[in-house]
A protein has these predicted regions:
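Short intracellular "coupling" helices and adjacent cytoplasmic loop segments at the cytosolic face
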Residues: 46-47, 82, 90-114, 118-120, ...
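Membrane-integrated ABC transporters
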Residues: 1-29, 36, 44-59, 65, ...
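Helix-loop-helix
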Residues: 47-57, 147-161, 231-313
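ABC-type nucleotide-binding domain
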Residues: 326-604
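An intracellular "coupling" helix at the cytosolic face of ABC transporter transmembrane type-1 domains
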Residues: 10-13, 98-102, 118-131, 135, ...
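Juxtamembrane helix-loop junctions of ABC transporter transmembrane domains
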Residues: 20-21, 25-41, 53, 62-109, ...
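Transmembrane helices of ABC transporter permease
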Residues: 10, 14-27, 58, 62, ...
Length: 604
């Protein structure tokens, strides 16, 4: 937890006052056995009722002061722990937002959710208990021993011998349990991930009648977590009985020695009661300490896992504003000297990309250029690298080799904000958030007017969808847009990107749920936009990209062909195969046309 202590810096006062008031509570608690001994040895022995009443009110005062100190300590501990957890959770969330897709792919969504919720809650609980009890228990144990020595040196030696044995037991159990708590949290990650996967894909599971297999797999993982939890629980449970045995042995020895001293006249009965009370206080606090150590072990394991997230550094760096301005001036001068650079919106120069730990590149030696205002279609088989290519344009990933240019400048020279403002992305999976349609559309541009929103909806063929909803723009969407159909969600996500009025618009197979008529109307509307936009259309439908100015054909990560529809039908086997698989009636016509062309050439 040491590396996370920085998030306590705004709660230094609370972190000091909480144990301080616990210390005051300990002082008041340690006075109580002495007062009780005085009541027995003086008040009762001398039949002095006045003395007994006086000491009784002192006991009441000590109890009241102890209670007030305890409540105050709890207040400061709660304030510090809750504030710490809030800042830590925000810091982790902010850190995750700045990680590149490479790190997010490596960490996994389920791991991040567990660490942002369960792990941070464990750390918060550990800090709260630590501030209240971590010092209180040692204070009581050591204080009881000191007070015992003030009563009788020989009897107090029992305390001095028992305490080291108790701490040895605590240390041994802690030594073995800490690594196991880390394993428990790891198993919890696995169960969380499996739960999320199965609940997300529950319709697919039922469609393939895989319920039994899904339940069996979950049961296996859950049993692994349960068995490990039981083992750790049994190990931790040893703490209390072993502590009790040692304390009870010490108590028997204490009473035996104290009884002998009373018979010899070296001690009074009240002092024996005081010694026993101090021993009882030690028992209670050592039990609390045992529970505290278990909690702190869990917190330490969780703190380490949270710290691991904060240690992950993004492999993607963005330039500072000053560096960016200087680079822009330099690149503008270069672009002015070379007119071709200023005409191109996007240029790929021998780009190769490989996902982390993939073992093979997903894109290899890709080169092409796109002029401003052009529409580019990207087509290819499953796994050919279509989404990967457009992700490089958005700089969700950095190219492993080669360069990607935006407006004649290396895309890595743009600041994050400037790059995002230029590019509008509609991903494959339509993602909407809980809130009104208006709130979701304004993700594109916060200052957009309702007129801008309706204009974007009209272009995205989503106007009728919104007009048919109660409240229209104020219609509330459920999480991930569950109260909309797939096609409706896609149209809203396209509209959200259009609200931004980006220079580069990327539609990553984002019209797959639209019928052919709506898809055609969408493409027609995109061609009539009132600003100059370069559009990238990723699609499985060759009909969706036939009218594109440039079509890129990908095959297993390589650029199999590029050109217009007519050019690719003549020159690219991969494109012909895709096209004719979707329009088989065209194959015969193409064959007859090709044969006629060959005969004509032979005749000539």
């Amino acid at each position: 937890m040491r590396s996370l202590a920085v998030y306590l810096k705004n709660y230094k006062k609370e972190s000091i006052l909480a144990p301080f008031f616990k210390f005051l509570e300990v002082v008041f608690d340690l006075i109580v056995p002495i007062v009780i001994a005085q009541i027995i040895d003086v008040g009762i022995a001398n039949h002095d009722n006045k003395y007994i009443v006086q000491r009784f009110f002192i006991l009441i005062l000590m109890a009241a002061l102890g209670l007030a100190s305890s409540i105050t300590a709890q207040f400061f501990a709660a304030k510090a722990s809750v504030g710490f957890a809030t800042k830590l959770r925000q810091a982790v969330y902010d850190h995750v937002q700045h990680l590149s897709f490479t790190e997010l792919d490596t960490l996994g969504t389920d791991t991040l959710i567990t660490r942002l919720t369960d792990d941070i809650n464990q750390v918060q609980n550990g800090l709260n208990m630590g501030l209240r009890l971590l010092l209180r228990s040692p204070f009581i144990v050591l204080g009881s021993m000191v007070m015992a020595f003030t009563i009788d040196f020989k009897c107090a030696l029992v305390f001095a011998v028992a305490i080291p044995f108790l701490f040895l037991v605590v240390f041994v159990i802690m030594f073995f349990s800490i690594p196991l708590f880390k394993k428990v949290q790891g198993k919890l990650d696995t169960v969380t991930g499996l739960t999320r996967e199965n609940l997300t894909g529950v319709r697919v599971i039922r469609a393939f009648c895989r319920e039994k297999e899904a339940v069996a797999e979950f049961d296996t993982r859950n049993q692994e977590l349960t068995k490990l939890n039981l083992f750790v629980g049994k190990l931790s449970a040893l703490l209390n009985p072993v502590t009790y045995v040692l304390i009870n042995i010490a108590t028997v020895i204490l009473i035996q020695k104290a009884g002998v001293e009373v018979n010899l006249g070296g001690m009074q009965q009240g002092q024996v009661v005081a010694l026993y009370n101090y021993m009882a206080q030690m028992i209670v606090e050592l039990i609390k300490l045992a529970s505290l150590i278990i909690t702190l072990n869990k917190s330490a394991a969780s703190a380490g896992r949270v710290a691991d997230i904060l240690k992950v550094k993004s492999t993607m760096d963005y330039p500072s504003s000053s560096t960016y301005s200087a680079q822009i001036s330099k690149d503008l001068a270069t672009a002015t000297a070379d007119a071709s650079l200023s005409e191109n919106a996007i240029v790929f120069n021998d780009v190769t990309f490989e996902y982390s730990k993939a073992g093979a590149p997903s894109l290899s030696h890709i080169s092409f250029s796109v002029k401003k205002g052009q529409t580019v279609g990207i087509i290819g088989g499953t796994g050919s690298g279509k989404t990967t290519l457009v992700n490089l344009i958005s700089r969700f990933y950095d190219a492993s080799k080669g360069t990607v240019l935006l407006d004649g400048q290396n895309i890595e020279n743009y600041t994050r904000s400037d790059l995002r403002s230029r590019i509008g992305v509609v991903p494959q999976k339509a993602a909407l958030f809980k809130g009104s349609i208006r709130d979701n559309l304004k993700w594109g541009r916060e200052d957009a007017s309702d007129e801008d929103l309706w204009q974007a909806l009209t272009t995205a063929q989503g106007k009728e969808v919104v007009e048919g909803k109660p409240g229209q723009l104020d219609f509330m969407l459920e999480q991930n847009g569950k109260n909309l159909s797939g096609g409706q969600k896609q149209r809203l996500t396209i509209a959200r990107a259009l609200v931004k009025k980006p220079e580069i618009l990327i539609l990553d197979d984002s019209a797959s749920a639209l019928d052919f008529a709506t898809d055609a109307a969408l493409r027609k509307s995109l061609n009539r936009l009132d600003w100059k936009v370069t559009t990238f259309l990723v699609s499985q439908r060759s009909s969706s990209i036939q009218q594109a100015d440039l079509i890129l054909v990908l095959d297993n990560g390589t650029l199999a062909g590029k050109g217009t529809h007519a050019e690719l039908l003549r020159t690219c086997d991969t494109y012909r195969e895709i096209y004719f698989s979707q329009f088989p009636e065209e194959r015969a016509r193409y064959s007859s046309v090709s044969a006629g062309s060959i005969m004509k050439e032979v005749t000539v």
